[in-house]
Regions:
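Acidic-glycine-rich active-site phosphate/pyrophosphate-binding loop
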Residues: 67, 86-99
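Small-aliphatic-rich amphipathic alpha-helix that forms the alpha element of a beta-alpha
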Residues: 33, 92, 98, 102-146
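N-terminal amphipathic, basic helical "cap/leader" segment at the start of enzyme domains
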Residues: 1-87, 185
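Short, electropositive alpha-helical surface patch
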Residues: 144-155
Length: 185
């Protein structure tokens, strides 16, 4: 399959099962991630890869954070957060490590991490795997940083849930480019 065809067919996979990429595949996937646009070569993207028993640890982090920081008392909601990491056999937490630079503001560093995430999703597809980028309360609350042993110069941009697509890839129609593109000539 040509690269353009793969790009045109890519979509997020909600249902993910084993297998997930092995360490050799992940090495190449991360190399692809690090090829993302990066003003001044700051390499702000950081990745926390979680699988196996690590999912249990993340489950505890989510539960503790929801209970202690979000002040959630409803056990059914707490259980939902506790179960969240088990929706995929691997999770990659997307982190931007901020660095002071006179020409590269924080937003550019976050955008570089986001581009790295897209490269990861595309590289996963090239190996026959799939993923979905999830965000929410556990992405945008800086109080979670301490639960993940991250410093205050870090921002969580989301979580890539990774594995093998469970079921067929959904078919998505192409969009009319005219709705999104204006041309100046």
């Amino acid at each position: 399959m040509k690269l353009i065809d793969s790009l045109l067919e890519r979509n997020s996979a909600r249902g993910l099962i084993e297998p997930f990429p092995n360490s050799d595949e992940m090495e190449k996937i991360y190399q692809a991630a690090l090829r993302a646009p990066d003003h001044a070569k700051l390499k702000p993207a950081r990745f926390i890869q979680i699988s196996g028993q690590g999912l249990n640890k993340l489950s505890s982090v989510f539960y503790d954070f929801a209970k202690n920081e979000l002040m959630i008392e409803d056990e059914s909601i707490l259980q939902k957060y506790k179960d969240a990491p088990f929706r995929a056999p691997m999770i990659i937490i997307l982190v931007t490590k901020h660095q002071e630079h006179p020409k590269v503001p924080l937003i550019e560093q976050k955008l570089s991490t986001a581009a790295s995430a897209q490269n990861i999703l595309l590289a996963l597809e090239s190996y026959g795997y799939a993923g979905i980028w999830r965000t929410g309360k556990f992405s945008f609350d800086n109080k979670l940083l301490k639960y993940l042993n991250l410093d205050d110069n870090s921002t969580i941009l989301g979580y890539l849930y990774v594995g093998t697509r469970d079921g067929d890839k959904k078919k998505i129609s192409n969009y009319s480019v005219d709705e999104f593109v204006s041309v100046w000539e």
